[in-house]
Amino acid sequence: MSTILLPKTQHLVVFQEVIRSGSIGSAAKELGLTQPAVSKIINDIEDYFGVELVVRKNTGVTLTPAGQLLLSRSESITREMKNMVNEISGMSSEAVVEVSFGFPSLIGFTFMSGMINKFKEVFPKAQVSMYEAQLSSFLPAIRDGRLDFAIGTLSAEMKLQDLHVEPLFESEFVLVASKSRTCTGTTTLESLKNEQWVLPQTNMGYYSELLTTLQRNGISIENIVKTDSVVTIYNLVLNADFLTVIPCDMTSPFGSNQFITIPVEETLPVAQYAAVWSKNYRIKKAASVLVELAKEYSSYNGCRRRQLIEVG
């Protein structure tokens, strides 16, 4: 059987750095190599494939279609190589474990501290990177291996066939306002159509479904501000009299009593939370432990559903 000579992994790393840096000169500085050495590596890769991968200009480099394909595939290859090195190194008790994951604000306000404390008991030297946002923001990073997994809300329009989905819990969401607002009894969404609203920025998941509900009740998109910042949401509600819809476990952030829930006649959607990770990469042991801890702490806290508090 003939042996196929494959490109060197280090050459792929150099190619990726050239694209990331935007020029051969900048990449050479980052890599600690000479500019001629980097140029030769790029030339060698192009000779190997027999096509031009980058267009060299005075202002830097741009990718050709073949270069775009190589960049995408090579990033997957080098990430898998890194995961393999970490996994094999992890067999040693002295190894440094790395894990990165995404999570929604609800997790940060509820069981994140307990989950991470427990994880650190198992992996005391682990390097943990956590990112807070909606699940839709994490999907590209999950698919290409930059994130080990993410927790978030699911919705019917999400295409998750290439991902493992581990259901965790359900949560009721409630309409929240500043305590300074005068409210009596139950109201309707339609009666609030002229109010200003603030919601998390996302194009799928729970808030996408909620947006449909709000618009169906006459609330215009022009009256809805979107942001990735939970702090900004609380600030606009507290100091600018905006309305928002958040999980029932987030109505008293850090013990604050500055917010109230407003009962509405309409039924707000219930959020389904799950952990998701790519089927194309074997999940790391450390990431798997975190997912199991998320399941464990979710069960401790029930399904996060509680009755609305009447305002009046």
Curated annotation (Swiss-Prot):
SUPFAM superfamilies in UniProt: Periplasmic binding protein-like II, Winged helix' DNA-binding domain
CDD domains: PBP2_TdcA
Keywords, ordered alphabetically: Activator, DNA-binding, Transcription, Transcription regulation
Annotation: DNA-binding region: 24-43
GO biological process annotation, one example: positive regulation of DNA-templated transcription
GO cellular-component term (any): cytoplasm
Keyword Transcription regulation (UniProt): yes
Pfam families for this protein: HTH_1 (PF00126), LysR_substrate (PF03466)
Start and end residues of each HTH lysR-type domain: 7-64
Source taxon at top rank: Bacteria
GO molecular function terms noted in the UniProt entry: cis-regulatory region sequence-specific DNA binding; DNA-binding transcription factor activity; sequence-specific DNA binding
Metabolic or biological pathway: Amino-acid degradation; L-threonine degradation via propanoate pathway [regulation]
Function of the protein: Transcriptional activator for the tdcABCDE operon.
Family assignment from sequence similarity: Belongs to the LysR transcriptional regulatory family.
NCBIfam families linked: PRK10341.1
Protein name (Swiss-Prot/TrEMBL): HTH-type transcriptional regulator TdcA
Species of the source: Escherichia coli (strain K12)
Gene behind the chain: tdcA
